[in-house]
Amino acid sequence: MINVEIVRHYNKWREHKQINKSLIKKITQNILLRFDNFSKIKQFELSILLTNAAEILILNKQFRNIEKATNVLSFPSNELNWQDLYSKLEFLGDSDYMHLGDIAFCYEVIYNESCEQYKTFENHFIHLLIHSILHLIGFDHQNDTEANIMENLEIEILSYFGIFPPY
């Protein structure tokens, strides 16, 4: 079971009815089912903030010391490493509950990027959601090897949902 909490701090998000708990749960489940190590966990939790440029700028400055709005910020609750996800190690312990983390999305930046990249707002949001969830479970793109692994997984998941890959 995946519990999703959505907080909307910007009314423009309400125009996109497809961006809802059901969509977020479906994508999260698709990602988690790819890794056997998550199979023992019965309940996952994920918090989503749908906000605007002013608020995300404050969060970006506070947590990353970058004074500019960004499309999305991910705050993992656990320090996971993507390499552990592919091993049979019991890296999650015996817990049957896991809070994946928090994700904050910025409406204006996502809107502008989707227009510039000739994508629908919803498809761009889905790509950023996939990217962010992968960050929450330990994926990163600090070097070319990690970036390629993460991008290939994103492409695979996007294709599953019928979305043309951006790379």
From Swiss-Prot:
Where would you say this protein principally sits, based on its record?
cytoplasm
Q: Which InterPro entries does the record cross-reference, listed alphabetically?
A: MetalPrtase_cat_dom_sf_prd, YbeY, YbeY_CS
Q: Where does Zn(2+) bind?
A: 131, 135, 141
Q: Which residues form the signal peptide?
A: none
- GO MF terms, alphabetically ordered: metalloendopeptidase activity; RNA endonuclease activity; zinc ion binding
Which residue spans traverse the membrane?
none
Top-level EC class: hydrolase
Protein biosynthesis among keywords: no
Q: Which UniProt keywords apply?
A: Cytoplasm, Endonuclease, Hydrolase, Metal-binding, Nuclease, Ribosome biogenesis, rRNA processing, Zinc
The molecule here is called Endoribonuclease YbeY
Protein encoded by which gene: ybeY
